[in-house]
Design a protein with these regions (language model features):
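Short, charged/polar surface micro-motifs in flexible loops or helix N-caps
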Residues: 12-16, 25, 42, 90-95
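A short coil-to-beta-strand element that immediately follows conserved catalytic motifs
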Residues: 62-70
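Active-site-adjacent beta-strand/loop module that shapes the phosphate/pyrophosphate-binding cleft
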Residues: 74-95, 105, 109, 122-128
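Conserved Nudix-box catalytic region and its N-terminal flanking loop in Nudix hydrolases
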Residues: 17-57
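Short connector loops at helix/strand junctions that flank enzyme active sites
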Residues: 4, 31, 36, 63, ...
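Conserved N-terminal beta-strand and adjoining loop/helix that marks the start
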Residues: 1-19, 40-41
């Protein structure tokens, strides 16, 4: 089966995750959801190269030691099957910038489940703890 290859990363600081509130793009399947940062592979990229690029593009931050946490496969009609490579990171440098896809906010880990997140994300948040 062919999968759309993507990455997702949760940066961690002071008991919080950096969350992206997707409110800026029109026709966004994630509109008004809170998600981590990440995106689709570009040609020739592997998961690590993709997540490094996406985090820098969306946040202005450069990860120094991302931790590969696993793979999550999504099957949800009408979208193509997606293979998401999940990362967390506690070591990063730089100054956070505005994101063209939404608003970035540090959210206490215990409050994330109360946000409008995808139902499937709730499963792996429990596993990340």
């Amino acid at each position: 089966m062919d999968f759309l290859q993507t990455t997702l990363c949760y940066l961690e600081k002071d008991g919080c995750y950096l969350m992206l509130h997707r409110v800026k793009k029109k026709n966004d399947a994630n509109h008004d959801k809170w998600v981590g940062v990440g995106g689709k592979f570009e040609p020739g990229e592997d998961a690590l190269a993709c997540v490094m690029r996406e985090v820098t593009e969306e946040t202005g931050l450069t990860m120094q030691a991302p931790a590969y946490r696993g793979i999550v496969d999504f099957y949800c009609t009408p979208w193509p099957a997606e293979r998401m490579h999940l990362y967390t990171c506690t070591q990063f440098a730089g100054t956070m910038t505005d994101c063209s896809e939404g608003t970035l906010e540090w959210v206490p880990k215990q409050a994330v489940q109360d946000l409008p997140i995808w139902q499937g994300d709730k499963i792996f948040f429990d596993l990340l703890a």
